[in-house]
Each structure stands twice: as structure tokens, then as C-alpha cells.
Amino acid sequence: MADPAAATKYPLLKLLGSTWPTTPPRPIPKPSPWAPKKHRRLSSDQDQSQTPETPATPLSCCTETQWTVLQSSLHLTAHTKDGLTVIVTLHP
């Protein structure tokens, strides 16, 4: 007991200090995240300088290519020389 006045005013407190086991306080747990974290990769100037620019004219001549934009998605449909149909959907 650090305060002698408390010991004379409350004599039973000294019994508490001698027999009561002292345990360290438990740390407060961190709350669980309410949603998973999404890690975004920020583009830097170095990344942009390494990506090739889109050519003004297509690399291959193709008259059968169709594309549509639906909300924020791009849908591409192309046909190969062998008659195979290729459908690509790009989402942001």
C-alpha cells in the first residue's frame, strides 16, 4: 500500500493486497474487419512508360470483329480464319 492514510481508514484493504492474486490486465482485442480489404496496385510513371501505346490502326485486318459496350463492360466477338468464334468480355 502506497498510501498509509488509506490503510488506517480502510484496514481491510491490506488483506486484499496480500491474498488477492494479481493478474496483469488483458489487452483489448482488435475488432474484426467488417469487409475484406482490397489491395489496389497504384500505377506509377514507370509502369506507364513500359506499356506500349495502342496503335492507331489494328495489327491485323479483320472485318468480322464486333464490339459492344454494356454499362462498364466491353464485349468483343471475333472470328478466326478457321471459322472459330472468339468472345471476350472485359470488366473494370
UniProtKB/Swiss-Prot annotation:
Q: Which residues in this protein are found as Phosphothreonine? A: 57
PTM info: Phosphorylated by host ERK. The phosphorylation triggers a structural change that enhances keratin binding and protein stability.
The UniProt record lists the keyword Disulfide bond: no
Report the GO terms under cellular component: host cell cytoplasm; host cell nucleus
The record's Gene Ontology biological-process terms are: symbiont-mediated arrest of host cell cycle during G2/M transition
Q: Which Pfam families match?
A: Pap_E4
Induction: what does the entry report? Answer: Expressed in the middle to upper layers of host infected epithelium.
* Ranges of biased composition (kind: Polar residues): 45-54
Q: Where is the composition biased (Pro residues)?
A: 22-34
Instruction: Name the consequence of residue 23 to A.
Output: Loss of E4-mediated G(2) arrest
The record's annotation in InterPro entries points to:
Papilloma_E4 (IPR003861)
Q: Position of motif Association with host cytokeratins?
A: 9-12
Q: Where is this region: Disordered?
A: 16-59
Q: Which residues carry this modification: Phosphoserine?
A: 32
Q: Which segments carry the region annotation Involved in cell cycle arrest?
A: 14-42
**What keywords tag this UniProt record?**
Early protein, Host cytoplasm, Host G2/M cell cycle arrest by virus, Host nucleus, Host-virus interaction, Modulation of host cell cycle by virus, Phosphoprotein
The protein's location, in the record's own words, is: Host cytoplasm; Host nucleus
Entry similarity comment: Belongs to the papillomaviridae E4 protein family.
Q: How does it assemble?
A: Assembles into oligomeric complexes. Interacts with host CDK1. Interacts with host SRPK1; this interaction may favor expression of late viral transcripts. Interacts with host cytokeratin components KRT8 and KRT18.
Domain notes per entry: The LLXLL motif located in the N-terminal of the protein is responsible for the association with host cytokeratins.
What's the miscellaneous note? The major E4 form is first synthesized as an E1^E4 fusion protein from spliced E1^E4 transcripts, such that the first few amino acids of the E4 protein are derived from the N terminus of E1.
- What does this chain do? Contributes to multiple aspects of the viral life cycle including viral genome amplification, suppression of suprabasal cell differentiation and egress of newly formed virions. Induces host cell cycle arrest at the G2 phase by associating with and preventing the nuclear entry of host CDK1/cyclin B1 complexes. Inhibits cellular DNA replication by preventing loading of host replication licensing proteins MCM2 and MCM7 onto chromatin. Within the cytoplasm, associates with host kinase SRPK1, a splicing factor regulator, and inhibits its activity.
**What is the protein name for this chain?**
Protein E4
Recall the taxonomic lineage recorded for the source organism.
Answer: Viruses, Monodnaviria, Shotokuvirae, Cossaviricota, Papovaviricetes
Gene name of the encoded protein: E4
